[in-house]
Amino acid sequence: MVPMTIKVAVAGASGYAGGEILRLLLGHPAYASGELEIGALTAASTVGSTVAELMPHLPQLADRVIEDTTKEVLAGHDVVFLGLPHGFSAEIANQLGPEVTVIDCAADFRLTNADDWSKFYGSEHAGSWPYGIPEMPGHREQLKGATRVAVPGCFPTGATLALLPAVQADLIEPDISVVSITGVSGAGKKASVPLLGSETMGSLKAYNTSGKHRHTPELTQNLKEVTDKDVTISFTPVLAPLPRGILTTATAPLIDGVTQEQARKVYEDFYVDEPFVLVLPEGVQPQTQNVVGSNMCHVQIEVDTVARKVLVTSAIDNLTKGTGGAAVQCMNLALGFEETAGLPRTGVAP
């Protein structure tokens, strides 16, 4: 039974994901009505600092002080968002009772295969929770009423939404190349020489190439849910001098006989009832600036008749649909709110 006032805590509140969750919660109709209350804000390195010092774009919370992330501080909350580094969520989640809805933005509970987890994260697998892409077949129902939710990674979100209809409808051979250009906020706030302005401004750089990126098994897992074929993915992330946004371009061999008209109809039919996925008109390409600050994913599907390939492009805001917005969308489903509550569909272009 949902309490009359839902008390929400955000662990990792001073990070980019935590800050985005707070921004969206402050605009949630349940917060405006008093049905939802923002409780403890916790972190590690910023304990004792105020929101005004760390996140002046959230003036409603200006006087709130960041606390330590402990079981005692998080006790008494109905919902706990975890925006912690990978590997820390399981420890905290295990200290919270089953009556608490825990929504984890880290990778700890995304992968179902323990070997994949060990290979890419180098620690013991903590298990898997309902996975937070409601647009995937069957996942919306799994998320309704869930008390444990794994928020997807930002790269798998953009790439999964780009490829899911093509793989499910057998438009392509699932030997797929994915290139995702991302803003630097995806790496978090921790100081790092490769993320300095002088290193990133005016420059593009691929990283964790040739199957090394941790999001590769997550994307593969997602696409395997909708096909019996073997799925092979070559994933290349590219760091761009942008604060936020991911532009994904995916290509794969076309199944003989598939036309542009057929491919486009598959995408339009697949996403016709999805509030946060927009298949753009023919000839209009997704741009990151058009989705910044929104929970939208813009998609374009094209058939390259010369190369005999399908080309799918998607754009998301890595902090909204890629993290914080996805977390709030999952909260809405878990608690029985309108799925779209508090989640903007309009971007802030240019």
UniProtKB/Swiss-Prot annotation:
Family, per entry: Belongs to the NAGSA dehydrogenase family. Type 1 subfamily.
Taxonomic classification: Bacteria, Bacillati, Actinomycetota, Actinomycetes, Mycobacteriales
Reactions accelerated catalytically: N-acetyl-L-glutamate 5-semialdehyde + phosphate + NADP(+) = N-acetyl-L-glutamyl 5-phosphate + NADPH + H(+)
Keywords for the protein's UniProt record, in alphabetical order: Amino-acid biosynthesis, Arginine biosynthesis, Cytoplasm, NADP, Oxidoreductase
Entry-linked HAMAP family: ArgC_type1 (MF_00150)
Protein name, per record: N-acetyl-gamma-glutamyl-phosphate reductase
UniProt organism field: Corynebacterium efficiens (strain DSM 44549 / YS-314 / AJ 12310 / JCM 11189 / NBRC 100395)
The protein's role, per its UniProt record: Catalyzes the NADPH-dependent reduction of N-acetyl-5-glutamyl phosphate to yield N-acetyl-L-glutamate 5-semialdehyde.
GO cellular component, as recorded: cytoplasm
Pfam family, one: Semialdhyde_dh
The protein's Enzyme Commission number: 1.2.1.38
